[in-house]
Amino acid sequence: MGIAVIAGSLILAFAWTAGLFGHQTTSKTFLGDTLKNFDPGYRRAHGKGICFDGTYHSNGAAAALSKATVFAKSDIPAIGRFSIGSGNPHAADNSTATVSMALLLSPADHSQWRMKLNNFPYFPTRNAEGFLAQQKAFKPVPSTGKPDPALVEAFLKEYPEARKSIEQKAKMPLTGSFSGAEFYVVNAFILRAANGQQQPVRWSMRPHSKFISLTKEQRDQADHDFLFKDIKKCLAEGPLYWDLVLQLAELGDPVNDPSQPWPKDRKEVIAGILEVKNVTDQVNGACRDINFDPTLVPPGIELSDDPVLAARAAIYSQSYNARLREIGFGKATDAVGK
């Protein structure tokens, strides 16, 4: 299956999981249906979000691993976005357990490092085709409102790694605040040092704030926009901080399989601290017009041969271009609180 086909199908899958498509959608019309069904001006996934700005304080600890200037000791402007996992920009914050961070770092040499992180440390399947198969297998049957058990079992037989993901997500604590969430990059990247040496890495944003866990009952009763109201309240009291933690792969660790976490005892390097200072509504915030395509990396950081990573560039491009057209016609609106 070609990357372009996978990319288009993934956009469709994101939309389907958000409940935005009817049963008449076909492979020929999915892009047109996408543009019609998504609220104009919103991102095609993680439609509900809020912009933030701050500073990334690089401590120089990773400079020996990569020639990228983002790892030299310096203070770098940061623009980012917090969001929830639903594709619906008007969704309640308790409608999904997924919370996310997107980030753009812009060092003085005019290079850029863009990244997208979620609060789950690995991808459900080993490739993009598996993700599509998962969406099909778990699509509710009209007569029961539940997935067909036979299709689910067939999917899990072909993609057994997904069972681990499903079980872990069922046990994952429900976060009550962006401020204490740890965010992970599930794909591997390659750091290239000035001498040419290469080091595969994944990374996370590890919070300084305490993780706030909610019971299911607390989350079910929470305010429609509780996460976004909370982040505003937290920042009114002062900046929030996350460590950028690089996890270094060793020989034999799966670099091209985002469904397989690396052993927890792998060496870690704290490359710097992200300081988040302010948030602004996404309708007019600095993050609105940014494409947080994680394949846009500076010299010194390279893409691995992870097939999911390869598919993501086209996904982000299609979503971004459609969104900019809509914004250009004045159709962008603010989701939070509406």
Q: PLM features: what roles do these ranges have?
A:
Residues 1-338:
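Active-site-adjacent core segments of small-molecule enzymes
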